[in-house]
Amino acid sequence: MKLTILTKRFRSSSPLRTSGSPTDTNPATQGQSTQTARKAETKGSRHHPKSPAVRKRRPYGRRRSRSPRDTTLRRGEGESARASAGSGERVAFISPGDVGTSTRSPPKGGQSRLRRLIQEARDPPIICLKGGPNQLKCLRYRIKASNSSDFESISTTWHWVHNKCTDRVGHARMLVRFISTEQRDRFLDKVVVPKSVSVILGAFDGS
């Protein structure tokens, strides 16, 4: 009977632990639980990465405004200024003495209006040979056979006529056209012109 009573007292003296009891107050146990909670949060953040930031796009329809300098350049200056500023193109102006030194028309496309006008200002250089008809015909035959690369084209012999009739006036004439004044000078250096034939330098106003 005494043994049974002692056992009951021992059981009743031990503290009862229920599900609603407070957490453990041991510092070591609390540290382990804190580390476990941090690891769980870290794993959760790895499985759920942050979504990338969305860039805002500019609304359509907006254009970059032009500076006053660009507007002045487009309105005030010509095509030559735009060409030299944009592509580095240099336009070589010609002197009055170079007018009439080209035999071919410039191409229509691929160049500025100023460059085309400068090229059109160059007219083909010529020489006018004046003498007897037979002398000029023999000279034409000789230079076509020996100096064909030193001129562009050559005419037949011709005469001026009177303004009121068809009578011929003066000596016969023949024209020789060149690409440049350099070619004409080279022609005059190579070709031997008879003393009875006069040489007159000139240029066409156009080709």
UniProtKB/Swiss-Prot annotation:
Location(s), subcellular: Host nucleus
Biased composition range(s): Polar residues: 12-37
Alphabetical keyword list: Host nucleus
Composition-biased stretches (Basic residues): 45-66
Cellular component, GO, one term: host cell nucleus
Region (Disordered): 1-111
GO terms, molecular function: DNA binding; DNA-binding transcription factor activity
Gene Ontology BP, a term: regulation of DNA replication
One protein family per Pfam: PPV_E2_C
Domain of life, per lineage: Viruses
Biased composition (Basic and acidic residues): 67-80
Protein family membership: Belongs to the papillomaviridae E8^E2C protein family.
Role played: Plays a role in limiting the replication of viral DNA in keratinocytes. Recruits the host NCoR/SMRT complex to viral replication foci to mediate repression of both viral replication and transcription.
UniProt-recorded name of the protein: Protein E8^E2C
Lineage of producing organism: Viruses, Monodnaviria, Shotokuvirae, Cossaviricota, Papovaviricetes
